C-alpha cells in the first residue's frame, strides 16, 4: 500500500530522537528528551523515605508524576493546579510511567528510599507518554549513579532498561512513532512499553475508527520491537557520554 505519512517518514522510521542529560542542576538525574517536536523534561529525585505501606520492609519505591505546560499544545490549557485536581488522563499516564520504571529496579537493592520521576511536557506533538518513559529511564540511571558515587548503595538496583514507543494504523498502513497529525487521524493507536530483553511491559491499544485484526496487531508489535531496539541504542549512547 502506497500511503504517504505527513512527515514523509518511512513506515518503520522513528522521528529524530535526542536525549540531553544533566539538563537541570538540582535533581540527581535529569534529561530533556525530544521525539521530533515533542519535548519532555524528566527529572529523578531521591528521597530517604518510602510510602507508608513500605515502611520497615527494607524496600524502596519508584513513582512518577506527569504534567503538561499550559501552552505545550496548539491552544492553551488551564493548569491542573488552577482547577484543583488532576485530570484522569494525567493520572493514567503517571501511573503508567511509574509501573514501567519499577520493572527495571530491584527495590530491595534500592533500600528504603524513593525515586520520583517528574515528567513535564514542554511541547506536545504526539507520543508524550512514550517519550516520558524513554527519557525517565535515563534520568533514573543517572540518579542511581549519583547514589553509587555517594556510597549509598551496596550494589546497583537496576536490572534492565525500559523504553516505549507508539505504533498505529494510519490510513490502512502500520506505522511507527506517530506524531500529532497521524495520532489524530489514525485507525488504531497503540503504546508499547518494552524492556531490553524483548519483554513486553505494557500494551495500550485502541481501535479509533475500525477494528484491527490479529495480523495487524502482530505487525504493530513487530514495529514496536524495532522501534524500542533503536531507542535502547539511543539510551545507551546518551548514557555513555
UniProtKB/Swiss-Prot annotation:
Transmembrane segments: none annotated. Coiled coil: none annotated. Keywords: Nucleotidyltransferase, RNA-binding, rRNA processing, Transferase, tRNA processing, tRNA-binding. InterPro entries: ExoRNase_PH_dom1, ExoRNase_PH_dom2, ExoRNase_PH_dom2_sf, PNPase/RNase_PH_dom_sf, Ribosomal_Su5_D2-typ_SF, RNase_PH, RNase_PH_bac-type, RNase_PH_CS. One of its GO terms (molecular function) is tRNA nucleotidyltransferase activity. The keyword Metal-binding does not apply. One of its GO terms (biological process) is rRNA catabolic process. PROSITE patterns: RIBONUCLEASE_PH. It is an enzyme of class 2 (transferase). Phosphate binds at residues 89, 127-129. Its EC number is 2.7.7.56. It catalyses: tRNA(n+1) + phosphate = tRNA(n) + a ribonucleoside 5'-diphosphate. Belongs to the RNase PH family. Phosphorolytic 3'-5' exoribonuclease that plays an important role in tRNA 3'-end maturation. Removes nucleotide residues following the 3'-CCA terminus of tRNAs; can also add nucleotides to the ends of RNA molecules by using nucleoside diphosphates as substrates, but this may not be physiologically important. Probably plays a role in initiation of 16S rRNA degradation (leading to ribosome degradation) during starvation. Homohexameric ring arranged as a trimer of dimers. HAMAP family: RNase_PH (MF_00564). This is Ribonuclease PH. It comes from Xylella fastidiosa (strain 9a5c). The gene is rph.
